[in-house]
Amino acid sequence: MSILSFLLGEKKKSASVAKERLQLIIAHERVGGRPPADYLPALQKELVAVISKYVHISDDDIRVSLERQDDLEVLEVKIEIPQA
């Protein structure tokens, strides 16, 4: 965040905030943090809350999973958005 944006009070966009949160979760997981079962349900609820601001969805419309294969981790988020 630059000094100018701090002084003018510009807010971060929700996409950049979500990206930062995901980066923190992944970094925490890589250094031996808590198991993925702890934060995945909370992440799913937050995603529902954010997306619900723009589109009507339910908890069942979002699925979050973390798969590990050797040294590769894949965070998969599937979102079903109803057609207008």
From Swiss-Prot:
Descriptive protein name: Cell division topological specificity factor
Any one GO BP annotation for this protein: cell division
Keywords: Cell cycle, Cell division
Family from the record: Belongs to the MinE family.
InterPro entries membership: MinE, MinE_sf
Keyword Disulfide bond on entry: no
Pfam families: MinE (PF03776)
Species name: Burkholderia cenocepacia (strain HI2424)
Transmembrane segments annotated in the record for this chain: none
Function description: Prevents the cell division inhibition by proteins MinC and MinD at internal division sites while permitting inhibition at polar sites. This ensures cell division at the proper site by restricting the formation of a division septum at the midpoint of the long axis of the cell.
Origin superkingdom: Bacteria
Record bears the keyword Glycoprotein: no
